[in-house]
């Protein structure tokens, strides 16, 4: 039997966004299971009401009053789909905390997410932005995204191609942002650890010795903590920006003018380090 949804009016969201803003939702509910989504869909269509999905509440600046329904995705659970000598496939509920998920995968000997440690938010929000950090993007590790389609009223899996992942972009963010509710994400992770250390700051932090996944995770957490305060102590929206991508020709011109320019080769040209650019402008912090 599907658990009924509980709707609350004039619900304060201050504890549910990382800025701690005292926003008030016109209506609020929590989704504990994908089985509740047809009822949610019906409720919204009956009232012709806008929907705001809420995960961990980062990358979000809320108005004082949020019209319509705010639905917080709280779907939990881990399901081991496949295990071989080389890899595992795990399906994880959209409401699981992202950082806790990364820590747990490393503890269980499943590798590939450690460079994405300490990114705020939930598992279900991660594909929307195609989160990435220190040489790894989510799309490198995803094999399916489980969704509820508000257009058809059906639940289905989308493969990575269907998700239209781009640089900090996806189907869910810019192409059809109001069509799907992500209910779970399936990852393909390695059983043997191979470190991804292209990011110079990470290499410097770890040195030249052989490293473990836990050491990479710890180093990433240390670097991120130096750059950004803990939202539990100082409210912030998290770290989100795009490194500008320029042509090889423009990169060569810029490198001539600014020999210390930090950039990385990219399939479409060169990716300039936004952090370095911000620092050079005197705007760090």
Label every PLM stretch briefly.
Residues 2-145, 149-151:
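Anion-binding (especially nucleotide phosphate/pyrophosphate-binding) glycine-rich loop
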């Amino acid at each position: 039997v599907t658990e009924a949804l509980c709707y609350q009016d004039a619900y304060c969201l201050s504890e549910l966004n990382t800025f701690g803003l005292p926003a008030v939702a016109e209506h609020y509910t929590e989704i504990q299971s994908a089985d509740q989504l047809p009822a949610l869909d019906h409720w919204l269509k009956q009232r012709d009401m806008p929907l705001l999905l809420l995960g961990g509440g980062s990358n979000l600046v809320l108005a004082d009053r949020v019209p319509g329904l705010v639905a917080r995705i709280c779907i939990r659970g881990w399901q081991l789909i496949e295990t071989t000598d080389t890899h595992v496939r795990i399906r994880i509920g959209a409401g699981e905390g992202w950082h806790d998920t990364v820590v747990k995968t490393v503890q269980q000997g499943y590798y590939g997410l450690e460079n994405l440690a300490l990114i705020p938010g939930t598992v279900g929000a991660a594909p929307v932005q195609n989160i990435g950090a220190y040489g790894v993007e989510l799309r490198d590790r995803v094999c399916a995204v489980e969704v509820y389609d508000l257009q058809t009223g059906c639940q289905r899996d989308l493969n990575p191609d269907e998700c239209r992942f781009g640089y900090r972009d996806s189907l869910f963010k810019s192409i059809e942002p109001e069509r799907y509710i992500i209910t779970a994400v399936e990852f393909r992770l390695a059983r043997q650890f191979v470190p991804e250390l292209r990011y110079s700051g990470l290499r410097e932090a770890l040195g030249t010795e052989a490293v473990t996944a836990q050491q990479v995770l710890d180093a990433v957490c240390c670097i991120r903590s130096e750059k950004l305060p803990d939202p539990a102590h100082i409210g912030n929206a998290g770290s989100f920006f795009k490194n500008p991508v320029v042509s090889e020709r423009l990169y060569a011109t810029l490198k001539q003018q600014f020999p210390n320019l930090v950039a990385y080769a990219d399939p479409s040209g060169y990716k300039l380090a936004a952090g370095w650019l911000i620092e050079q402008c005197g705007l760090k912090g």
